[in-house]
Amino acid sequence: MLSSTLRVAVVCVSNVNRSMEAHSILRRKGLSVRSFGTESHVRLPGPRPNRPVVYDFATTYKEMYNDLLRKDRERYTRNGILHILGRNERIKPGPERFQECTDFFDVIFTCEESVYDTVVEDLCSREQQTFQPVHVINMDIQDTLEDATLGAFLICEICQCLQQSDDMEDNLEELLLQMEEKAGKSFLHTVCFY
């Protein structure tokens, strides 16, 4: 498969940490990538664990950054949120919801099982138009800076292997089994159709 033809999406809950870290790394490697969230709002860590800071998906990363800077620069610098939002702003203006995207992808990576379920349910509820297959692969990635980076590199490695594959459809299952052994992670995988 030619590198320019593999169309990749990465989806997490809020399109802030895990999907954007993967977006950043895949983009640097020259892949065609988009990233998304699935929830109705973006939730970021707040002053207490049960009090997140909530934004609408229409809020830009720059607006979130400036709002958190005003609220508590020290807290949001210390926990890495300002760094994450700064990185995100360099990639795209703001978070996007997967359910509102009409683009077609070859592979969609999700970062937790509930997101995988939402993506598969959304794809199955759409009217099929082209019957083009899309592989949906879940890899559980904890929502921490370190785990987001490790998960992004694993997603990148899978994408690079798929780019070198003569037949993605035939080789994907074997590749995922090899990656499960190598990384010590298990994957969920299904095929949906556009």
Swiss-Prot record:
<dbReference type="GO" id="GO:0006369">
    <property type="term" value="P:termination of RNA polymerase II transcription"/>
</dbReference>
<keyword id="KW-0539">Nucleus</keyword>
<dbReference type="InterPro" id="IPR006811">
    <property type="entry name" value="RNA_pol_II_suA"/>
</dbReference>
<keyword id="KW-0378">Hydrolase</keyword>
<comment type="similarity">
    <text>Belongs to the SSU72 phosphatase family.</text>
</comment>
<comment type="function">
    <text>Protein phosphatase that catalyzes the dephosphorylation of the C-terminal domain of RNA polymerase II. Plays a role in RNA processing and termination.</text>
</comment>
<protein>
    <recommendedName>
        <fullName>RNA polymerase II subunit A C-terminal domain phosphatase SSU72 like protein 4</fullName>
        <ecNumber>3.1.3.16</ecNumber>
    </recommendedName>
</protein>
<dbReference type="InterPro" id="IPR036196">
    <property type="entry name" value="Ptyr_pPase_sf"/>
</dbReference>
<dbReference type="GO" id="GO:0005847">
    <property type="term" value="C:mRNA cleavage and polyadenylation specificity factor complex"/>
</dbReference>
<keyword id="KW-0904">Protein phosphatase</keyword>
<dbReference type="GO" id="GO:0006397">
    <property type="term" value="P:mRNA processing"/>
</dbReference>
<dbReference type="GO" id="GO:0008420">
    <property type="term" value="F:RNA polymerase II CTD heptapeptide repeat phosphatase activity"/>
</dbReference>
<keyword id="KW-0507">mRNA processing</keyword>
<dbReference type="Pfam" id="PF04722">
    <property type="entry name" value="Ssu72"/>
</dbReference>
